[in-house]
Every structure is written in C-alpha cells, then in structure tokens.
Design a protein with these regions (language model features):
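Short, aromatic/basic amphipathic alpha-helical patches
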Residues: 117-127
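Short beta-alpha junction loops
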Residues: 108-113, 139
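Glycine-rich phosphate/pyrophosphate-binding loop and the adjoining helix
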Residues: 130-159
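N-terminal beta1-alpha1-beta2 submodule of the flavodoxin-like/Rossmannoid cofactor-binding fold
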Residues: 1-77, 84-86, 91, 95, ...
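Short glycine-rich anion-binding loops that position phosphate/pyrophosphate groups of nucleotides
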Residues: 80-83, 111
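P-loop/Walker A phosphate-binding loop and immediately adjacent motor/lid segment at beta-alpha junctions
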Residues: 49, 102-103, 109
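Structural beta-sheet core signal
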Residues: 6, 77, 105-108, 133
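Short, conserved loop/helix-junction motifs that constitute active-site signature segments
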Residues: 69-70, 95-102, 125-127
Length: 159
C-alpha cells in the first residue's frame, strides 16, 4: 500500500487547520516544518520582512524532521503564500530533501486565494514527480466549510 506524508508550514494557523483536517480524514504521516526564524507576527514588519524573505529566496534552518522521504510514494505539501511565493521554510525543505519520483499534491493558502504562482514555483524544485493535484485556498480558517469541501479533492487524488 502506498504511504502518504503531509509536510506543512503554518504561520498564522491557516495551514495548520488544513493539516488537521487532512490528518482526520486520511491515513497519512504529518510533519510540521519549524524554522529557526520568522517575521514578526503582526504589524507592517510581518508583511515587509515576510514578503522580502520570500521574494529574496532566503533560507532558514529547520528543526530536524524524522522523515525519510524515500519511504513515501505520495507527498502533500501545504503552505501559506507570502508575496505571491512560498515561504522560506518550504524552500529550505525542498533544498534539504530532494523530492524526486513522487506523487505530489500542493496546497497553497492566502488572503486572495491566488496561490497558483507559488504552486508553480514548487514544481520547479521537484524532479520527475507526478503532480496529482493542487489547491489554492482563501483564508481557510475564515472559510472553514468551503475549505473542508475543497479538501475532498486531496482524498480523491490518493484514494
């Protein structure tokens, strides 16, 4: 039977909500990315520093994960969108763990619901993966019922 892992980074809790929903629905292992540094949680610095770090392609040091990526056939990667990009924690993960020959589903969430550019950027960092789907969610914690409904497609992709 194919094994599935969900790897996610959450900043304000939206991606954490997505991870919790998927963990309750699917047979998968969940891994949260914890960076050594993050932008301020509020104020203008949140947007300036967070956006700058995403645009600049900054690396962050991640807390060690107990994941052997080669043990999984299916990967779900979930993250918030920062300045139209994926956050530094995702970039660091993709650099540290070479993602190759997997079935991959990518979930991005943002205030606008427009995460396509960030999703496409992830695709440039993986090799020979079969992209089985992607989702761009708008403020999942504020639109819980809508988000839950949209997550059905993730289950179907690996079901």
């Amino acid at each position: 039977m194919a094994k599935t892992a969900l790897i996610y980074y959450t900043f304000e809790g939206n991606t954490g909500f997505i991870a919790e929903e998927l963990e309750n629905r699917m047979d998968l292992d969940v891994f949260r990315l914890l960076p050594d540094k993050e932008p301020p949680r509020s104020g203008i610095g949140k947007f300036l520093l967070g956006g700058k770090s995403a645009l600049a392609g900054d690396d962050v040091k991640l807390a060690p994960l107990s994941i052997d990526v080669t043990a999984y056939d299916n990967l779900i990667l979930a993250f918030p969108v920062w300045a139209g990009r994926f956050p530094p924690a995702i970039l660091s993960f993709l650099k540290q763990y070479k993602i190759e020959d997997k079935n991959l589903f990518v979930i991005a969430n943002s205030a606008s619901g427009k995460g396509d550019a960030a999703i496409n950027a992830v695709m440039n960092h993986v090799k020979n993966c079969r992209i089985v789907g992607s989702l761009s969610l708008r403020n999942p914690m504020q639109n819980k019922d809508e988000a839950r409904g949209m997550l059905d497609v993730v289950e179907k992709a690996f079901g």
